[in-house]
Swiss-Prot record:
It holds the Pfam family p450. It is a single-pass type II membrane protein. Its EC number is 1.14.14.-, 1.14.14.51, 1.14.14.53. Belongs to the cytochrome P450 family. The gene is CYP71D181. It comes from Origanum vulgare. Its cofactor is heme. Induction: Slightly repressed by Spodoptera littoralis, a herbivory insect. This is Cytochrome P450 71D181. The keyword Heme applies. Expressed at low levels in flowers, leaves and stems. Pathway: Secondary metabolite biosynthesis; terpenoid biosynthesis. GO terms for cellular component: membrane.
Amino acid sequence: MDISISWVAIILVISSYFIFMNKWRAAKLPENLPPSPPKLPVIGHLHLLRGGLPQHVLRGITQKYGAVAHLQLGEVYSVVLSSAESTKQAMKVLDPTFADRFDSIGSQIMWYNNNDMIFSRYNDHWRQIRKICVSELLSPKNVRSFGFIRQDEMARLIRVFESSVGVPINASEEISKMSCAIVCRAAFGSVLKDQGLLADLVKEALGMASGFELADLYPSSWLLNLLCFNKYRLRRMRQRLDDILDGFLEEHRVKKSGEFGGEDIIDVLYRMQKDSENKVPITNSGIKGFIFDVFSAGTETSATTIQWALSELMKNPEKLAKAQAEVREKLKGKTNPDVAEVQEIKYLHSVVKETLRLHPPFPLIPRLCKEECEVTGYTIPAKTRILVNVWSIGRDPAYWKDPDTFNPDRFDEVSRDVIGNDFELIPFGAGRRICPGLHFGLANVEVPLAQLLYHFEWKLPQGMTPADMDMSETPGLSGPRKNPLIMVPTIHNPTS
């Protein structure tokens, strides 16, 4: 009995504390906040996130309360942006104000205390790492120079599918291996020995770095922080990550040269680490954080987009036939096509854009409002977490006819691109924090997809129809398929 009374007392004290803090914070909020659903004591709107993926639930909220909505998730105030107009104002007009990131337990542990580029705060460290990344890895010249790597890895992938003719094969797994190898060879000069384990860690980490952990939403609660079991799971994952990256970096130190016979980006980072004139020191943790960035943003997003493109084409056989017909006409007689040849295939570009519209690599883009400002007439308080619902914008009937339908032909009538200028379609973000690797990523999607459509006829496993396909997504920062894509390849015979 005494124990029960003690627990009740503890719960009452904790609840009273949170209620008091919520009222104190609410009293300091400006009056002209965006619309908000009714909320509960202590948890605010947290209960509304039950029963679905965050991007789906948040779309329902903004459809009811407006494209800009204010939410209290635990202790944390957030604003959801779900329109092209509000997103343009935040990411273009007020870009410096919204260029920051907020912390999460997942990003702090797995991305080395946000000492990377993706999750870094908007500061000199971020500017320095991004500049190195763009100049040494992601310039248009470098993207073109990686053509032979794409050709090598595509040849390997084609051999894998040729050896499985007529047999169901896990296409998701093989495409992920190919994407991983391309990025490793381009960035680091060789394929990592443990790249499979690293790819698995990336998928797991992206699923746990969304910022929706209870400890993320109640940052002042030492008890929830202590009881956050995912934190201990993440620390075990981080130890495995350290073991892999430490081994790779040690091998890198003793090797003489990479695939290109000269410096790769790791060599550049090590050279700059020794430069005493750098305003911001480059630490070993920063180098490891950058490597994990390359994997999480470079391999997972390209592989996921190819898998979704094939999934949508398999679900829409008439679109698949049209895409294959154009690819085979444009690439006829060409061996080892790369970016220059694929650029001529208009319908393929439309397929990729339509895939990115329906399945953006990062459905919710996290930002942090640095100082109080106004967006579409509403006041956004300083330090408010911003969630740009890219997934919802891409399915908004105000911008897209039949928005939930996969229809690449829509781009014959609608001139929109994915490079951050058209805010109805921003799968790579926009503004100064737009994904620096978008051209590299697009090349690593379009070239492999073209070759897979050129060389093979694709069928679903026996007894399965397009209507039976599971198009569910996995929870987390990225939006990969929940279940692997299983297909049956048959070699295309041009003379038949």
